Swiss-Prot record:
Organism encoding this protein: Acinetobacter baumannii (strain ATCC 17978 / DSM 105126 / CIP 53.77 / LMG 1025 / NCDC KC755 / 5377)
Any Pfam family matching the protein: peroxidase
Entry similarity comment: Belongs to the peroxidase family. Peroxidase/catalase subfamily.
Gene that this polypeptide is encoded by: katG
Top-level taxon: Bacteria
Disulphide bridges: none
Cofactor, free-text remark: Binds 1 heme b (iron(II)-protoporphyrin IX) group per dimer.
Protein name (record): Catalase-peroxidase
EC number per UniProt: 1.11.1.21
Any GO BP: cellular response to hydrogen peroxide
PROSITE patterns cross-referenced by the UniProt entry: PEROXIDASE_2, PEROXIDASE_4
Enzyme class, spelled out: oxidoreductase
Single Gene Ontology MF annotation: metal ion binding
Cofactor: heme b
Amino acid sequence: MSNESKCPFSGHNSKPQVTVGGGTANLHWWPNQLRVDLLNQHSERSNPLGKDFNYRQEFKKLDYYALKADIKNVLTDSQDWWPADWGNYTGLFIRLAWHAAGTYRMGDGRGGAGRGQQRFAPLNSWPDNASLDKARRLLWPVKQKYGQKISWADLFILAGNIALESSGFRTFGFGAGREDVWEPDNDVNWGDEKEWLAHRNSEALAGSNLAATEMGLIYVNPEGPQASGDPRSAAPFIRATFGNMAMDDEEIVALIAGGHTLGKTHGAAPADHVQADPEGAPIEQMGFGWANSYGTGVGKDAITSGLEVIWSQTPTQWSNYFFENLFKYEWVQERSPAGAIQWVAADAEAIIPDPFDPSIKRKPTMLTTDLTLRFDPEFEKISRRFLNDPQAFANAFARAWFKLTHRDMGPKARYLGPEVPAEDLIWQDPLPAASATPSSASIADAKAKIVALGLSAGELVSLAWASASTFRGGDKRGGANGAHIALSPQREWEVNKKAVETLTQIEELKASTQLSLADLIVLAGNVGVEQAAQAAGFNITVPFAPGRVDALQSQTDVESFQLLLGLADGFRNWKKQGVNTPAEVLLIDKAQQLTLTAPELTALIGGLRVLGTNWDGSQHGVFTQQVGVLSTDFFTNLLDMSNVWAPVDSTSEVFEGKDRKSGTVKFTATRNDLVFGSNSILRALAEVYAQADGKEKFVQDFVAAWTKVMNLDRFDLA
């Protein structure tokens, strides 16, 4: 058999193998290519459960306390393939839950535990998640037993809670409701570094959406910045990373100390004994990674972080030993068996139990970042208070742990299960209880009063969009429910200036209707859409679901809500001054946060432009002579080859469209507008609506996408 005739998949042919999805990708040739593909993540094509599956309904069939009992049994059912420290997986499951939730960042609301992402790359193979593949596999028999009645995302967090409870700790509660997805969240920017554990400075962290000091870590390097072994210099990095998760100093101290009250780290030998992570491991390892050639590779020979630290005399039982040991002893720097920097209590007796040999005792050990809680002045004050008041520490940790593990779930209305705390917490963006649903007659009366105001379709639509478009699909915050546009800080946002002028008139109607202001705002937008569609020759009724309520200023964390402003809203042609990111990139970001598909994005932009909804009243992208008519003019004029476009200055932010022959300026546009003609994917979508038979479809698609945005935060309708 000649070389030329050998099978190309046999491994014996020197010719390049042709594989599906292989070869040089578009992003190689055009690394700045617009990521329109991010709008098509998590489609029905990747979901094996189908579009009719309802997790909330399935969860209600669950025997919740039987599930808890089964998870508790797993804790002490040590497996030979991954033996439990002290015969108990408590520390491992706490770390599993912590690291599932700890990727959340409040800046853009992405990351976190809400979608079970730790099952997928890159998180399943982050250096900081080493050995959590074993924790997930330990839970598989439980997941297999209960099936779709419990998601992996909920199971990870619940396992952490049960681990704490089994140690004698009283948790604050648990809310289920995290729905699994079936592929990685490719929209999350984990950083630009191309090497694991590449370091970032604290100033850059504080001004970014990144939640870790190094690529592949959950928070900070436990050896200190760049493994310096300096507890004091670690403080600003700790504050920056935990601060990006909305944690204050007390919560930081409570979380670090509470998380390190139980369990241990693993560093039996140098890292050169450790093989590939799960994504890079050989197929026969069946999704496991970090195979360890040192000794048995498990148990006393385990290598995870490379650190070998046990903080407490009772590492499977809740105690105050972390703080007692932290302040009782003088700490001397040492190296773990793996060569990592850690600290040992030089003046202590050997009082720490060995995890596998009860005849062996060790001296207390700490991480560099643990000592930060003693040597940073502000952290030290809190730590001493917790030292002297163990109950205050336990209460603070219980609340901080609940916040850590639920911060990305959105409003409490999404929580499921019998252990949801009754208390409303400010970070949950609480809302008043809903009153009686308004009748059809009262809705019709309110619509008539809105029409009587004589406001334009664009004014009505602009207000509703400003109210609803703050929604973030990552952490389920924002949206029209609550009418937060009437409160600080949203009422003062520059981008809402014209919308608030309309809001003032809608507010005056509230007393004479049976609707909440939040409902009135959305209804006003619907009226505007209906008027614009009628002007285009289509009589439609935009779906309206009443039941929204009005938040109080006292229920609104101004600093937290300020983050919902974001960097841009390309739907209104607004971009924050000083932001250098191209507008079209931020438009995709905004659309992805609104959970829009590429076709929905296209329909909404085309409709909003012809209605004249730019934040400042400018004519950029308003490619029509019939402003207020829900026409396809945006698309037909954008794709009209009689127009030629050029930037008005060197920034290439604003463009003029001139008649190709006469040179007369016909339109102006931003990058948000022209991208629907320049990007090949978005142009293909724009062409659908620019075609002769696209008018009715456009109106239908716009109304559907509009209604979706108006209801994004209506979790009560699910």
